[in-house]
Swiss-Prot record:
Pro residues compositional bias, start-end: 1398-1407
Lineage, opening ranks: Eukaryota, Metazoa, Ecdysozoa, Arthropoda, Hexapoda
SUPFAM superfamilies (alphabetical): L domain-like (SSF52058)
Domain of life the protein comes from: Eukaryota
Polar residues composition bias: residue spans: 1253-1270, 1316-1328, 1377-1391
Name of the featured protein: Protein artichoke
Domain LRRCT: 919-963
LRR repeats: 64-87, 89-110, 112-135, 136-157, 158-181, 183-206, 207-230, 231-256, 257-280, 281-304, 306-328, 331-356, 357-380, 382-404, 406-429, 430-452, 453-476, 478-500, 521-545, 548-571, 573-595, 597-619, 620-643, 645-667, 669-691, 692-714, 716-738, 739-762, 764-786, 788-810, 811-834, 835-858, 860-882, 883-906
Amino acid sequence: MMLLPIFLLLCIGINLIRAESCPPSQAILPCRCSLRGKEIQIWCSHSNLPQIMDGLKAVERNIKGRIDELVLENNQLPALPGRFFGSLQIVRLMLRHNSIERVSNGWLNELENGLVEIFVVEPQLRSIPAESLNGMINMLAITIQSEELKHLPDFSGLLSLTYLSVQTGALQELPSHLFRHLPKLQHIHITGGSGLTRLEAGLFDGLISLKNLDLSHNGLNWIHLRALSRLPNLVSLKLSHNQISDVGMVGRIVKDLEHLKKLRLDNNLITVIEDGSFVDLPNLSELHLNDNRITELQYGAFLRTPQLKTIYLQNNLIRRIHPESLLQASGSGVEAVHMYNNEIGHVEALRALLDALPRLRYLDMSGNLLSELPYGALRGHGTLEQLHLNHNHLRLIERDALMAMPALRELRMRNNSLSSDLPLPFWNLPGLKGLDLAQNQFARVDSQLLAGLPSLRRLDLSENGLIELAPNSFRHNPLLETLNISSNELTKIHSSTLIHLERLFEVDASYNQLKSVIAGLPRIVERISLKGNQITSLPAAASKDLQLPNLRMLDLSQNRIEQLPRHGFQGAMELRVLSLAQNELRQLKDTSFIGIQRLELLHLQENQLGEADERALLPLAELRNLNLQSNKLEAITDNFFSNNSRLEQLDLSRNLIRSISPTAFDTQRSLEYLDLSGNALLDISVGLGNLNNLRDIDLSYNQISRIQSDVIGGWRNVVEIRLSNNLIVELQQGTFRNLPKLQYLDLSSNEIRNVEPGALKGLDELQEFVLADNKLVELKDHVFEELPSLLASHFQYNKLRYISPESFHNANSLVFLNLSNNHFRNMENIGLRSMRNLEVLDLSTNGVKLVSTMPLKALNWLVELKMDNNQICRIQGSPFETMPRLRVLSMRNNQLRSIKERTFRNVRGNIAILDVDGNPIDCNCEMQWLSVWLQETNFPYPGPKCQDGRLLRSARMERSLCVGADIYGNERTDGNQLPLLNEHGDVFQRDLPDDFNDECEAGEGTRLPGDRPLVGESEYFYDQYVDATEAPDTTHSAISTSQRPKPTPTINSNIDLNNTILHTKYFNRKPQPGSGSPFTFFGYPLPSVSLGRFFGFGDRGRKQRTDSNDDMPATHRMAHISLPSGRGKTRMYQPNSAEFEKYLKDQQKQEKLNIARNRYVDTDSTTSSMEDALSNESGSAATTVGVFRTTFREPSSIERGGFRPIVPAHVGGFMPVHDPQQRRGLVEVVNITGNPSEIVQGIGQRKFIPISTQARPKPTKSSGESSETATYEVTETTPDITTTTPLMQRIATSTTKASTTTTRSTTTTSTTQVTPAENNASSSTELDSQYDDEDLEAQSVTLLRPPPLVQTTTAETILLIPPAEEHVAQIKSRSWVTTTTPQSPSDNQVTLAGPTSTVPPPPPASPPLRGGGRSTITKVYTPYQQQVAQPTAEEYQRTTPSGDNEGVASEHQLTANAQKRTELELLQVDRVDRKDGMDWYYESFKKKRDFNGGAAVRKTAHKEVFYDGVAASSSWNRLHKEILFISLLLLWRAC
């Protein structure tokens, strides 16, 4: 009895522990669980209604406590039934993009007491029952976003509700009973209803706690006088973006809102502010009237508004302001007026404002039509501090026009037409401290211009065309601190011009024509910029021009300096930053930097340095950043960096370095970043092994042939290693050991042929590695071992033909795999078994011909699958059936003629993009389902074409021709579709009609020399048949129909062969009468009856083979063996008995996958650097940017976008959730070089083109030109599709609804600038000309077509959750770019042949060159029922032409009467047989089979028995025997 309480306490403790922890992922699929502190979050995605319901039930079984957040996202849930969430204890609920159209009345039953917040983002949601929210006593926040919701549920009675947000485009009215009895409601947001035009009386009556009411973005044009009555605590009212034209109506409505402080009426239709518009608003402090059509402020517009402080009137059409529009009592407190971008052309309006607003402190009149300021126009205002008159038409300012303004501190008059020819001085402003006169026409400056400004501190005279500064120009401004005279035409500045300015600390004289350093600078100066001048030499040490003891920054870049004087900088002992980049320096002497011991940053890039004294840097003991990029250094000696122990960043790229001394970096214990790319290194120097603190090293574009593990083993803190574009041949075991912090490894574009097992073992933090563009042929077992954090792998542009199933051992986090542009012929050769967590798989541009079920069976989490540019001619079975989360499936440019509806039956509801363009589709009744689907889903692309050129979506099939087919193209038959099989899976030949032909027959069964044998290919297969007689050798060309003994039309659709796997072939033989089996059991057809087999005699041979312990494969290609008599036998093998049971209508339960989903780690996503090829290099080797540097980013943790409870005085809700109608990321637009039609077809050869840039680029004033330094931006755009062409340049772009506007773009062939209009016109016109024939295609133009050359995929689509805002930094430039030069179509084009010609395309003349690649970031969402173009999948773009891979040669064809092995096929490379390491393949058919709802395992008396060659269990034989025995008993009893 004493043990019972202990047992109960133990059970309670276990339950408490389970309640506070997450169950394993496989237990609650398709949901996932994560912890955030002590809070539990459940996230269910990419599934359908039955799976989600099963997942929620599993969650209910495994989690007994409360669930803090439940997120259902990107599912296919058309409706939510009652008690959908069961008895789960949900605190916060999020539904986002699940295609929900309606919910039942009791969908939230049993959640009344616990639910605190609801967040619903469902664009297709049409109805929410009015009473569905009743009883939610603890509800604090509700958010609903939809496009179809016309009627809102009843919110009344939610006593705890504090926050309500509803955004719907179909809302037309707001009944008054919706908002009753809400005593705690503080915030209401009702937006987006363009049909909501009226607000009736008493709508918000009695909301005593309401503080913020937002009714913006609706169609309101009438509001009842008492619609907003009895809101005693309302502080903010937002009515912007409506159709309000009567501002007086609003003024009368808000008159009773005593505590109203902020009123927003911007973006309406207001044309005039009439008398009495705003009266008796005692607490109103901020009024927004901007972005209307206001032309006039009339008399008495504002009356008794004593607290009004800020008025926004910008972006209107104001021409006149009445002097008494703001009466003295009303305008006495106004402090800021924004009036920019109006049409005020007379200074009287400006004067009226100043007179009416005696306390005005800020006035912005920029962007108006003011042309002159007469005498005394702006005088006598005692409080004005800031006056902005930028971007007007000012040509005349009379003498003393600005005076008697003692408080004025800042005056801006940028971009006018002022000149020094006007009467001076303009002003008498003793308190003015900042003056901006940039972008005017002052050619000369003398003392009269700045007279009357004794307190001036900051002066901007840039971009004026100045040619002269008089020596006494600043005589009246002794307090001047900052002077900007950049971008002028000054050639000399007199030494006495600035000498008396004792407070001057910054001078910017960049981009002038100065020949020498400015003389006579005051000793207090701290910052000097002389960038972009014509300075050829620096003053000698004896000169006082650089005797500046306080100087901290000196920029002398982009000049013509050839040498540095001895001790030239010793007078600037406080110098911290020195830039001598882009000059003509040829050597560094030991005395060049003496005297500047405190220097921290030194830029010497892009000079001609070929000789540097090893003592030149000895004085720089404090140096932290050194840039020697793009010089001509050949070696790094022992003592060159010996005294720079604090160096943190060192750039030695693009030199000619061949050797590094073993002791060169002995003292660099602080070095974190080292760039040695673009040199001539032959190995990784031993001297680099001492960099213990190194975090980032770039050794790409060298001639390194071997990686010394003992050297890189010293980089214990390294995070990124780049070794691309070298000559590395092999990765040996343990090459990258002892690198515990390594996250990114780039080995692309090398000569790697072999990766030994364990070469990348034990890298616990490795997230991404790139082995693209190498010469890999196969990946063996345990090549990539123990990589728990690995997320992405890149193998594109190799020669891969085989990947072992155990190649990724203990790498369970892999979610992105790129295998495009390889030599895979069969998907069975890709070991995907251990990659169960894959979400993105790219198999584009291989030689795959058949897509079958088994190779893809384990990919339950796959979201995106790309198989473009293969030779796929058939999809067998249902390979996508186990992919409930599949959103993107692309099979462009293959050989598919027909696509069965049943192939996509289980994924049609969830898939967003199904791209089969470029296939020779037969537009017959079988394809009608796809045509209907394209129309029903409003698919944003034109879709595939028929062979006659029509679009499939617009093709119409007559009903009379499709009598036997349903709406999905499935042929209806009254007969039995089950093929007649024996217990081995043989199909009797009498069931195969004469007109049957396998579409892929001519292309199967052959391989190139050196390919591994297929799975299951062994001598045992041929033991079942008589030996074949050798046939004469055949040619490699396609076999024409004349060579065949008889025509072979397509297969009769009455025969369903879906229960077979991989490849099936049949001889043509006339069928026996009747299509079904003569034996049935209760209507189910029975296979062939063999009494000998029934009593055991038929299994003798199989038992003997089984006892010999030969592991037989699970699948095999069909074999045709020519017999002397001309008769043949056909074998078909089944993967398991469960496939056949589908025809017997037995429901088979899928086994739960034991997969670990540990990839959601809450880490900060870091922005990967994406390198451009946009700079100049002279005298060095051609070096390109890092080719396969991707922008893969670790997936955001699922907590991002979660809930924060919304309570008073607390910001909460789903704040980070991004609007799905907008895309984020880089949209890259480039110019098209060459013939557009050839480029679209993917034909071309890449070459490198150097860019020649000017030595000193000047800023340009034209909007169509770009300056020397481009700014790379990330813009949020509407979801229009922007076509990305192969040649890519990073530019700032913005995409609008119907067009793409490019702000800056440059061509790659010259320095000529291309205007945005020219760029868009050239690209769109040339490409649009291809689609003039079809109306639907003409509507799509090119923005709706995926890029033809996109064949690879980046990893940003892994989660399909919008990431947080990215901050893309400006990246260093490169001097070489890649472009695509078109070739003739005959060089590399694939011509589609007829049914009997399946000759593969010839290989290219040479392997693909190493080239640049770039990522394009887009997002994929479910295509909703609206006219909104959906973005394409994220794609990894390679700038080299795809072509066909090296070695993709013609395969041998099978004739109709024989199958022979040619001499070429017999010359196979001697490899380990495929069966070694394929135990997992055979084990999959040893699993327990659930035949009758149980899990019984059927065993024979001896060891387990397999089917001949197909690894089938003996249970199927036993089932045959049992069925036959029962049938015989029934027949005996009937007799």
